[in-house]
């Protein structure tokens, strides 16, 4: 089945860069999803740019193309990893390879899990560990 690439502006500076999976029929291996599912990822364009989450491993090329289109020639400053379920995190290593200057933002537990998921990935000098209640200012957007 042909994959359909999705790209849409949510606001002038928040862009949906996720992908739709019409092949999957079970979410989490147990819940029927007869129309497939979306793997959500967003790009925030501000003084600093942030990519929110990655997508399922089977959609690396489509997702990276969507991110590049959303960035429109800019380089991402941050990859925000909200949690390590594979449909949100499978392409962290691909992102780091594509954008080696970007900083990966996550909490302590998430970084510990990343080591298990991606044992060869080197984040030395490229990670920002956040704690509950901390904020990250991108410009007019502040992530908490």
Functional labels for PLM-detected ranges:
Residues 1-7:
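Short, Lys/Arg-enriched N-terminal segments with co-localized hydrophobic residues
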Residues 7-67:
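Conserved beta-strand hairpin/beta-sheet module of binuclear metal-dependent hydrolase folds
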Residues 9-12, 106-144:
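Metallo-beta-lactamase
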Residues 26, 91-92, 115-116:
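Short glycine-/acidic-enriched loop or helix-start segments at secondary-structure transitions
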Residues 49-50, 78, 141:
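Structural motif
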Residues 58-105:
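Active-site metal-binding motif and surrounding structural segment of the metallo-beta-lactamase
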């Amino acid at each position: 089945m042909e994959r359909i690439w999705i790209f849409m502006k949510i606001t002038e500076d928040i862009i949906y860069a996720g992908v739709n999976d019409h092949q999957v029929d079970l979410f989490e291996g147990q819940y029927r999803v007869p129309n497939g599912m979306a793997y959500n990822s967003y790009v925030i364009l501000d003084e600093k740019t942030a990519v929110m989450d990655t997508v399922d491993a089977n959609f690396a090329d489509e997702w990276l193309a969507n991110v590049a289109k959303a960035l429109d020639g800019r380089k991402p400053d941050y990859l925000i990893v909200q949690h390590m379920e594979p449909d949100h995190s499978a392409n962290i290593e691909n992102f780091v390879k594509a954008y080696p200057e970007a900083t990966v933002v996550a909490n302590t537990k998430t970084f510990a899990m990343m080591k298990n998921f991606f044992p060869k990935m080197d984040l030395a000098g490229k990670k920002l560990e956040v704690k509950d209640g901390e904020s990250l200012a991108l410009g007019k957007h502040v992530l908490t």
